[in-house]
Regions:
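Short, small-residue-biased leader/transition segments that mark boundaries at the very start
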Residues: 1-3
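Extracytoplasmic gate region of multi-pass secondary transporters
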Residues: 13-62, 125, 129-130, 180-181
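Transmembrane alpha-helical cores of Major Facilitator Superfamily
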Residues: 24, 55-59, 86, 167-175
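Helix-to-loop junctions at the C-terminal end of transmembrane segments
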Residues: 65-77
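C-terminal transmembrane helical hairpin of 12-TM major facilitator-type secondary transporters
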Residues: 78-128
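Intracellular juxtamembrane helix-capping segments at the cytosolic ends
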Residues: 123-153
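A late C-terminal transmembrane helix in Major Facilitator Superfamily
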Residues: 146-190
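A membrane-interface helix-boundary motif in multi-pass transporters
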Residues: 184-205
């Protein structure tokens, strides 16, 4: 990714970093789960041939991404993203109940819940991407108009800053592809269980619920 000098001011926008966090939680989760699901399933349910089933998750997430964008165009990216994060937190919490503990665990429940995570991560990556485009266009036009700029200038700068934001945030989201498998691996090495990593993910999704609601869920938000 390369940001030109004319696009550098976008790095000073608070919303760039907030939306990067939300996109990391959705798109990052999608590619991270895609990379780590088979490994996690194999360690928790070694008797199951997960290779025959692992591809369904990424497939569901990829289809859901397009659906998430389409739904957001109709109902609003903020609303869809908020509801989606709530479900991601719920599925993350349910995952604890499916893992082997004192018993052998429940693979069918584990698989079903994880498919739910793939679905919501895919939907969320589409809805947050739509949020980024809409919000950056709004705040850029507002900022230029407040400085006395013309409609043409506002539209031109909105295109430039939105494109820069989408490129930068997309790169941040890709970090999840590295972080999630590493988190699972570290938790397994330290405790023999993925529970530690899952607790971090659950807390992260709850934070994203609060962030989406408090910053973007209200009718007006700071235009900085």
């Amino acid at each position: 990714m390369c940001i030109r000098d004319s696009q550098l001011p976008v790095l000073q926008r608070l919303h760039l970093w907030l939306l990067s966090l939300l996109y990391l939680a959705t798109f990052g989760s999608f590619i991270g789960f895609s990379a780590g699901f088979a490994m996690l399933a194999k360690t928790q349910f070694p008797d199951v041939n997960i290779l025959r089933l692992a591809f369904f998750g990424p497939f569901i997430g990829a289809i859901a991404r397009s659906v998430g964008g389409a739904i957001s165009d109709k109902f609003g990216g903020v609303r869809v993203t908020l509801i989606n994060f709530i479900f991601m937190a719920i599925f993350s919490a349910l995952l604890f109940l499916t893992l082997p503990g004192t018993g052998s665990g429940n693979f069918i429940a584990f698989y079903a819940v994880f498919m739910g995570l793939f679905l919501t991560a895919g939907l969320g990556s589409g809805s947050t991407f739509q949020m980024i485009a809409v919000i950056f266009r709004q705040i850029t036009i507002y900022r230029v108009k407040m400085k006395g700029g013309s409609d043409e200038q506002a539209q031109r700068e909105a295109v430039t800053e939105t494109a820069a934001a989408l490129g930068f945030i997309s790169a941040i989201g890709a970090v999840g592809g590295f972080f999630i498998p590493q988190a699972f691996g570290m938790s397994l090495n330290m405790t023999g269980s993925p529970v530690g990593a899952m607790k971090v993910f659950l807390i992260f999704y709850i934070v994203c619920v609060l962030l989406t609601w408090l910053v973007y869920g209200r009718r007006k938000f700071s235009q900085k």
